[in-house]
Amino acid sequence: MTTEIQTQRALYQEVYGEPLVVKNLEIPKATPGSVIVRIAAAGVISYMKNIYNGKRQFPYPTPIIPGSGAVGRVAELGPDSTSLKVGDLVFIDPVIRGRDGTSDIFLFGVHSGHSDGGRKLMEGEWRHGTFAEYAKIPIENCAPIDEKLCCGSTEEGGLGYQVSDLVDLGRLLVPFGGLRDIELQPGQTVIVAQPTGGFGSAAVQVALAMGARVIAMGRNSSKLENVVRQMAPFTRPGMLETVTISGSVETDVKNLQKFRPIDAFFDISPDEAINSSHFKAAILSLRQEGRVSLMGGFRSDVPIPHSMIMHANIRLQGTWMCTRAQVREGIKLAERGLLKLSGSAPKEFALEAWDEAFEYANTTGLLTVIVP
């Protein structure tokens, strides 16, 4: 990194819940265990507006530079880096874990996690996020991307992506973690609920890329039809089916029976769906030794068919985000063209237009990035 450059432009929140401002701040320095990344594009989560205005009540310290998953280039290396090189294109994995306590986890720039260790990490060394020209990132959270494969022209064997397109990896890697944890295999059948949100539709896309048949289960039939249309480039006839949630467990089970045997159920439902009939119905529809991935946002306990789970040897697997190994596995799938990124170019916004970016992501659900 050029030594003459001392300051950078960054979004900054002084007080929790207050509007962000663009400030000139000192560029961070690389220290042991860290990398300085020049941010090319930082992802805007669909509900990011309600994170930083305080409505979601996500815990995080202030003052803070917001921003989470991103793509950028290595600008400066810490003294203990052995494989990364200045100029390398990297995906910034926002799931930061303690090095001496891997159960201490927080989401970079967004959420301080659920342990004292996670809070310590976010309040200290790794407080500031990616809505800035430069960001200080743990070495292990910088996943290299093969730029020639991903961004090279199709005539030369590349995939033809723009660098900002690669931010979509962040959306796809979340459900990839849950699907890998339940060992979804090619040719198997998985129920995905609810498939119409950002991460739900990503789960459908990822499961298809993994070679599974998907039953997309949602409340709104017209939105399910939209999912089918969106997934057309990623599938073929017979690999994506839909079931509309009826409100009756018995009816839902009956509607799922035609697709048996069903190997797995992936749930990423929001808290608003906590009383939905689909949850119990999907579990009841699984084959012997079926698996359940729980990645949803339920804040209260939900009833489960205990007897059936016991007698059918059903496995329940909770997953929060994904592991470092899974990040690299997912990137390899994308580099080889098996896991395709969003079919449309991301909407780009400057730092000053952060409010417009948040609103656009919130109202459209489409891929949105801030380009510092």
How would you describe each model-predicted region?
Residues T2-Q6, G177, S277-K280, R324-P372:
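C-terminal hydrophobic helical "lid"/dimerization subdomain
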Residues E26-G43, K55-L107:
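Glycine-rich beta-strand-centered segment in the early N-terminal region that forms part
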Residues D88-L89, Y134, T189, A209, ...:
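Residue-level marker of beta-strand positions
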Residues R97-I191:
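NAD(P)H dinucleotide-binding glycine-rich loop of Rossmann-like/cofactor-binding domains
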Residues G152, E156-G247:
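Mid-domain Rossmann-like dinucleotide-binding core that forms the NAD(H)/NADP(H) cofactor-binding site
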Residues I182-L184, L208, I215, L224-E225, ...:
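Glycine-rich cofactor phosphate-binding loops and adjacent beta1-alpha1 units
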Residues N220, F298, C322:
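Residues in the short beta-alpha loop(s) of Rossmann-like NAD(P)-binding domains
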Residues R236-G238, G290-S293, I304-G343, L366:
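Rossmann-fold dehydrogenase core element
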